[in-house]
């Protein structure tokens, strides 16, 4: 499981999933919910891509840890969904705040974007988690077992 190939595949799958998901979802939130201009949102997404590349695999490891805890707490499917939301919100919100500060968003825009992102994450539930699981299967991450709570 810890061979260089499987770690590389795991990192690439996690990176692909995070860059695609965060680019699409956060741009929609920034423009339509938080009132950022298209230019501000594009700047934010351009800053976010290298950040997402750096944090994607650590996030995947963090999520897997949260999933193991959730699996021990309850085998129910809702536990996986709740764990996905918790992992995403607690890991991504601080990173998102820093990105928005970097591109010059004001505190009102930051609060709107981050709170909207939290609400959207809760409403979409485990969409990112399912997408991440799909990407891991797509990239044939060796010895990967779909995270089930």
Curated annotation (Swiss-Prot):
Residue stretches spanning the membrane: 16-36, 46-66, 85-105, 112-132
Which InterPro entries does this entry report, sorted A to Z?
A: Ala_export_AlaE
- UniProt subcellular location: Cell inner membrane
Q: Which domain of life is it from?
A: Bacteria
Keyword Membrane belongs to the record: yes
For this UniProt record, the keywords arranged alphabetically read as follows: Amino-acid transport, Cell inner membrane, Cell membrane, Membrane, Transmembrane, Transmembrane helix, Transport
| GO MF annotation: an example | L-amino acid efflux transmembrane transporter activity
Stated membrane topology is: Multi-pass membrane protein
Q: Name one process (GO BP) from the record.
A: amino acid export across plasma membrane
Instruction: Please give an example of a GO cellular component term from this record.
Output: plasma membrane
| Family, as annotated | Belongs to the AlaE exporter family.
- Role, per record: Exports L-alanine.
Q: What is this protein called?
A: L-alanine exporter AlaE
Species annotation: Salmonella arizonae (strain ATCC BAA-731 / CDC346-86 / RSK2980)
Q: Which gene encodes it?
A: alaE
């Amino acid at each position: 499981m810890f061979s260089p190939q499987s770690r590389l595949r795991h990192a690439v799958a996690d990176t692909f999933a995070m860059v695609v998901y965060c680019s699409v979802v956060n741009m929609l939130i920034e423009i339509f919910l938080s009132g950022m201009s298209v230019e501000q949102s594009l700047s934010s997404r351009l800053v976010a891509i290298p950040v997402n590349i750096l944090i994607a695999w650590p996030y995947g490891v963090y999520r897997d840890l949260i999933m193991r805890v959730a699996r021990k707490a309850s085998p129910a499917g809702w536990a996986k969904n709740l764990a996905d939301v918790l992992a995403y919100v607690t890991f991504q919100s601080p990173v998102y705040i820093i990105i928005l500060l970097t591109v010059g968003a004001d505190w009102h825009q930051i609060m709107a974007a981050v709170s909207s992102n939290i609400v959207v994450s809760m409403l979409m539930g485990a969409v990112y988690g399912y997408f991440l699981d799909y990407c891991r299967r797509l990239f044939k991450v060796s010895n990967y077992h779909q995270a089930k709570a």
